[in-house]
């Protein structure tokens, strides 16, 4: 998925940036990607495939969010989470509350804020792959 995507609504915190390229990270397969603005190359994010870290992650994507990227069903989109990776990568977290949807057919993307409070904005990537974040007292 090394392509340019149009984000008509921008990303949260960056509403004016509309075009981003998804860049492969060598050796990371589909688990880790980089999302870089084509309009401001100083703006970039680390993306993680959340299901690799949280196999029980099961976000309910509202139909209107799917329609916004030109998808008829959740099966037509790729879903990633924006990660924060500090110097000590073992403390990396993912924003499971606001995943990023990509429709590889329309080349449209959208960040979605879920109404599901089981998922937090700073979920540790390396603390228990079998858990749903809510099981940890959220």
UniProtKB/Swiss-Prot annotation:
SUPFAM superfamilies (UniProt xref): BH3618-like
Localization per Swiss-Prot or TrEMBL: Cytoplasm
InterPro entries recorded: Flagellar_assembly_factor_FliW (IPR003775), Flagellar_assmbl_FliW_dom_sf (IPR024046)
Keyword entries, A-Z: Bacterial flagellum biogenesis, Chaperone, Cytoplasm, Translation regulation
Keyword Mitochondrion: no
Major place of residence: cytoplasm
BP-aspect Gene Ontology terms: bacterial-type flagellum assembly; regulation of translation
Tree of life domain: Bacteria
Disulfide bonds: none
One cellular-component annotation, GO: cytoplasm
Function: Acts as an anti-CsrA protein, binds CsrA and prevents it from repressing translation of its target genes, one of which is flagellin. Binds to flagellin and participates in the assembly of the flagellum.
Family: Belongs to the FliW family.
Subunit organization: Interacts with translational regulator CsrA and flagellin(s).
PANTHER family reported in the protein's UniProt record: FLAGELLAR ASSEMBLY FACTOR FLIW
The protein's name: Flagellar assembly factor FliW
Organism (species): Symbiobacterium thermophilum (strain DSM 24528 / JCM 14929 / IAM 14863 / T)
